[in-house]
């Protein structure tokens, strides 16, 4: 969780509106994360992010990031046992640029634009191709000081609606899939114990804003199901799908609530030099 935590160089991912409140003029970060290393040794996520504050007033900033996810080498075998098969190297990447600005002393907003490229295909199949899409994030951040237990604490709130954009296709536009659009809301509190020790608590709620894929009914023919699938899922626009995602769960309102993922984070910091962090994440099975 991080939509409402204090600004840092990696805010581009969680909430780019936080860049407007960054203390430093600029920052750059590079990270490399092995993925499922106990199962495979060549799957990893690389992430590069940075920002720069514009002007002398420090009320606005630009940010950018590059994400590259390598799925390693995947062996593909033919149905014919006599054919040797081959190896593919699927990967996905996203490049985005954001602009953030303080709208008041305590409130900021940001817009991010993103290009997504996903190459999961194998070239031997001419019907399958790499997919690309464009998306945008809309983010807000509010921070202020409040008095708790006679101490000045930093209370912050954040919102980020991410990956609002076009659909992505892997077959030259014959069929297309929704991007993983998300709505993330959060709050955080920094409580100074004394001049050297600080406790931070953060909380996030995340809603997947993609419509539920219809399930074929017991008395429904395949043709009837495919017609309903096109009408209620395949042919609707991404924007309509966002609104539909709040009311289309088969289990009604209870299932809509179960779709929300919850995250809780706790951080202890000593003298702004040493930190210990822990968190808990929950989502319905």
Tell what function each PLM region has:
Residues 1-285:
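Subset of outer-membrane beta-barrel
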